[in-house]
Amino acid sequence: MTQSARVKLTSINLLKLDGVCGIIMDIGKRTGVRIKGPTPLPVKKLHIATRKSPCGSGTETYEKWEMRMHRRIIDISADDKTIRRLIDLKIPDDVHLELFLT
């Protein structure tokens, strides 16, 4: 029975995220299933401003920090073998993978 799987990838490292997307696309092409994606989602930006001076006296100067979270979605209509390969996939620690089956 053919199922459809949605793979949602999130990472702060864009190169590792694109590498995992490439591996998933290769798995889909080798097994001959229909693949849709990787679709880039908007980048989430987390901004934090901290004060440079620890004592609180002097001019107010701030350091600004930003973390960007890159996201991708891949839709696969797959059989059991392909889904098992996706579950057994070894991914870097920086990449978070969510797999939704429908």
Swiss-Prot record:
Q: Which gene encodes it?
A: rps10
* Family membership noted in the UniProt record: Belongs to the universal ribosomal protein uS10 family.
Its cellular-component GO annotations read: small ribosomal subunit
Where does the source fall among the domains of life? Archaea
Biological role stated in the UniProt entry: Involved in the binding of tRNA to the ribosomes.
Signal peptide residue numbers: none
Per the record, the GO terms for biological process are: translation
Q: Which organism is it from?
A: Cenarchaeum symbiosum (strain A)
* Alphabetized SUPFAM superfamilies for the sequence: Ribosomal protein S10
GO MF term list? structural constituent of ribosome; tRNA binding
Q: Which HAMAP family match?
A: Ribosomal_uS10
Keywords of this entry: Ribonucleoprotein, Ribosomal protein
Q: What is this protein called?
A: Small ribosomal subunit protein uS10
**Subunit structure, briefly?**
Part of the 30S ribosomal subunit.
